[in-house]
C-alpha cells in the first residue's frame, strides 16, 4: 500500500506546481544564463541598446560612421611619387667625374595618404573629375666637371636638373583633337603680307590635276 501512495503523492505535487505557475504566469521562470521566458500573451520588447546603436552596418553609409575621414565628399590630396634617377653627364667623348641625381616625374598622381614619400601635393575636389598627371615643376642648375680622354684638360658644364614635380589636371578636352580646327584658315597671317584667298589656290590645284595623266 505504501508503494502505491508514493506515485500518487508525486503526481499531486507536480499538479500543484503547475497550478501555481499558471496563477503567477510564465515570468516566474527565469533562465539566469541566457534569456527570460516571456508570457504567452506578451511579446518581448527589444532592448534599448540595439535601438540606440549607431555603429551598426547600415546600407546608407556602407557600414562606416557618417563623418568618415575617407569620405568621397571631403577634399583629398593628390601628389606624385618621388623617384630619384642617377646618371652621368656626357658631352661627346667627355664624361662627368661624378654622377648627378635628379627627380623623374612620370605616371599618374595618387592619394597623398598612400604615398609616404610624396611631393607636390595639390587639392583634388572631385573624385570623378579630371585626370591628374605628374609633370616637372621646378628645375635647378648644377655645374659639373667633365673629364676628357687623351690627357685633355677637364672642363665644366652647367646642366639643368628636375628639382620638384607637381600634379597637373588634365580634362577630357585635352584629348579631343577632333574639336580643334587645324586648317590653314585658322593660322594668323604674317605681318607685311596679305592673306591669299583660298578659292584661287583651289582652282589652280584643280587645273593641275586635270592636266595630269
Curated annotation (Swiss-Prot):
Subcellular location: Secreted
Family assignment from sequence similarity: Belongs to the sclerostin family.
Main location: secreted
InterPro entries registered for this protein in UniProt: Cystine-knot_cytokine, Sclerostin/SOSTDC1
Disulfide bonds listed in the record: 80-134, 94-148, 105-165, 109-167
Gene Ontology terms, MF aspect: BMP binding; carbohydrate binding; DNA-binding transcription factor binding; heparin binding; molecular function inhibitor activity
Record carries keyword Methyltransferase: no
Induction statement: Down-regulated by parathyroid hormone (PTH).
Designated name of the protein: Sclerostin
Function noted in UniProt: Negative regulator of bone growth that acts through inhibition of Wnt signaling and bone formation.
Glycosylation sites: 53, 175
Signal peptide: 1-28
Keyword line: Disulfide bond, Glycoprotein, Heparin-binding, Secreted, Signal, Wnt signaling pathway
One Gene Ontology term, aspect cellular component: protein-containing complex
Organism classification: Eukaryota, Metazoa, Chordata, Craniata, Vertebrata
Keyword presence, Membrane: no
Regions of compositional bias (Basic residues) in chain numbering: 190-201
The CTCK domain, residue ranges: 82-172
Residue numbers spanned by region Disordered: 178-213
A biological process term (GO) from this entry: negative regulation of ossification
The protein's assembly and partners: Interacts with LRP4 (via the extracellular domain); the interaction facilitates the inhibition of Wnt signaling. Interacts with LRP5 (via the first two YWTD-EGF repeat domains); the interaction inhibits Wnt-mediated signaling. Interacts with LRP6.
Amino acid at each position: 500500500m505504501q508503494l502505491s501512495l508514493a506515485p500518487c503523492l508525486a503526481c499531486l505535487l507536480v499538479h500543484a506546481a503547475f497550478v501555481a505557475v499558471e496563477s503567477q504566469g510564465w515570468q516566474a521562470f527565469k533562465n539566469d544564463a541566457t534569456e527570460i521566458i516571456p508570457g504567452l500573451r506578451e511579446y518581448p520588447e527589444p532592448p534599448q541598446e540595439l535601438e540606440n546603436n549607431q555603429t551598426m552596418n547600415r546600407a546608407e553609409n556602407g557600414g562606416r560612421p557618417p563623418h568618415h575621414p575617407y569620405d568621397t565628399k571631403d577634399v583629398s590630396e593628390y601628389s606624385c611619387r618621388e623617384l630619384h634617377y642617377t646618371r652621368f653627364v656626357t658631352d661627346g667623348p667627355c664624361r662627368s667625374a661624378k654622377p648627378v641625381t635628379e627627380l623623374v616625374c612620370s605616371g599618374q598622381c595618387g592619394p597623398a595618404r598612400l604615398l609616404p614619400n610624396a611631393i607636390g601635393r595639390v587639392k583634388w575636389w572631385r573624385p570623378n573629375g579630371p585626370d591628374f598627371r605628374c609633370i616637372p615643376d621646378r628645375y635647378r642648375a648644377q655645374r659639373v666637371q667633365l673629364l676628357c680622354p687623351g690627357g685633355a684638360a677637364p672642363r665644366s658644364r652647367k646642366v639643368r636638373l628636375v628639382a620638384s614635380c607637381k600634379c597637373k589636371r588634365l580634362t577630357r578636352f585635352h584629348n579631343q583633337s577632333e574639336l580643334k580646327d587645324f586648317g590653314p584658315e585658322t593660322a594668323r597671317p604674317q605681318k607685311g603680307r596679305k592673306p591669299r584667298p583660298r578659292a584661287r589656290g583651289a582652282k589652280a590645284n584643280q587645273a593641275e590635276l586635270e592636266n595630269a595623266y
